[in-house]
């Protein structure tokens, strides 16, 4: 099978919905009857491709169509200042994308901010959701065990304000449990992605100044989610603590939790092979 590349799968769509008028970038991989939409996190320089490049081909090879959406304010998508709930904003954009692609129902796989977006979408358009996979995100709220904002979120916000290679390395050094995969090439690629869109960095900082609670607490509404849900967490997550994952499975009745030991905030990257097998089994049974 020909390797799937970012360039060959790169596409754009115009989303117009009320006050929204945004050019959104996405990658469209495979031609399966069922579609999995992957949603990235909020780190500077993030993108769907950067977040999930270790997870695309196994799903495509198993017969799924895989869509990687770059949320507004990241990668090649238009920038925006979010003064309200970014979770709801991203969900509206996702709704626009799946409407444009004429997809009646999708499975959603969301990491960190992507998990928040997946929950927001599921609460508003439950009839459009097949199954959910949430990793390192899905609801806000205060941890009873970890002072908030967490160590990782402090470094992330600091990197947005001062996008230097030194601050990037500080953040990414606690992003994962095992730092041996963090090469200088990876650091440089991420830095280049950040600095290529300084408007994204500035607008994220402006968004926090306008509304510090970009990702609201959905805890009181989790019981409304009926979709079968797989929650995946790293025991050593220093961005969003494990007890948040426990809150998700406590609130979503049709859910299960898998915890990776020796794993930080990026389970789909740190434990890719096991993660891919687990997600495929969940989606196909």
From Swiss-Prot:
The record marks 190 as: Catalytic role in ketonization of the dienol substrate (substrate destabilization). The keyword Hydrolase applies. Pfam families: Abhydrolase_1. InterPro entries: AB_hydrolase_1, AB_hydrolase_fold, MhpC_alpha/beta_hydrolase. It catalyses: (2Z,4E)-2-hydroxy-6-oxonona-2,4-dienedioate + H2O = (2Z)-2-hydroxypenta-2,4-dienoate + succinate + H(+); (2Z,4E,7E)-2-hydroxy-6-oxonona-2,4,7-trienedioate + H2O = (2Z)-2-hydroxypenta-2,4-dienoate + fumarate + H(+). Catalyzes the cleavage of the C5-C6 bond of 2-hydroxy-6-oxononadienedioate and 2-hydroxy-6-oxononatrienedioate, a dienol ring fission product of the bacterial meta-cleavage pathway for degradation of phenylpropionic acid. Keywords: Aromatic hydrocarbons catabolism, Hydrolase, Plasmid. Belongs to the AB hydrolase superfamily. MhpC family. Pathway: Aromatic compound metabolism; 3-phenylpropanoate degradation. One of its GO terms (biological process) is 3-phenylpropionate catabolic process. SUPFAM superfamilies: alpha/beta-Hydrolases. One of its GO terms (cellular component) is cytoplasm. Coiled coil: none annotated. Its EC number is 3.7.1.14. One of its GO terms (molecular function) is 2-hydroxy-6-oxonona-2,4,7-trienedioate hydrolase activity. This is 2-hydroxy-6-oxononadienedioate/2-hydroxy-6-oxononatrienedioate hydrolase 1. Homodimer.
């Amino acid at each position: 099978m020909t390797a799937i590349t970012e360039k060959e799968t790169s596409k754009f769509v115009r989303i117009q919905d009320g006050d929204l008028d945004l050019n959104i970038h996405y990658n469209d991989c495979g031609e399966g009857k069922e579609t999995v939409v992957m949603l990235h996190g909020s780190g500077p320089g993030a993108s769907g491709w950067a977040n999930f490049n270790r997870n695309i081909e196994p799903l495509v090879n198993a017969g799924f169509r895989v869509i990687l959406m770059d949320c507004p304010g990241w990668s090649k998508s238009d920038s925006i200042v979010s003064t309200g709930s970014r979770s709801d904003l991203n969900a509206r954009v996702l709704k626009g994308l799946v409407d444009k692609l004429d997809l009646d129902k999708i499975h959603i796989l969301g990491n960190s901010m992507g998990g928040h977006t997946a929950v927001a979408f599921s609460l508003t358009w439950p009839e459009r959701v097949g199954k959910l996979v949430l990793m390192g995100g899905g609801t806000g709220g205060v941890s009873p065990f970890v002072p908030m904002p967490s160590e990782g979120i402090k470094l992330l916000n600091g990197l947005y304000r001062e996008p230097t290679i030194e601050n990037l390395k500080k953040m990414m050094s606690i992003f994962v449990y095992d730092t041996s995969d963090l090469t200088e090439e990876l650091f440089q690629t991420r830095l280049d992605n950040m600095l290529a869109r300084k408007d994204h960095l500035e607008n994220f900082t402006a968004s926090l100044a306008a509304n510090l609670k970009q990702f609201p607490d959905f805890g009181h509404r989790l019981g409304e989610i009926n979709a079968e849900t797989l929650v995946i967490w790293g025991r050593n997550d220093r961005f969003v603590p494990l007890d948040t994952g426990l809150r998700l499975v406590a609130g979503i009745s049709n859910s299960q939790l898998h915890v990776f030991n020796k794993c930080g905030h990026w389970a789909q990257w740190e434990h890719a092979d096991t993660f891919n097998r687990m997600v495929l089994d969940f989606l196909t049974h």
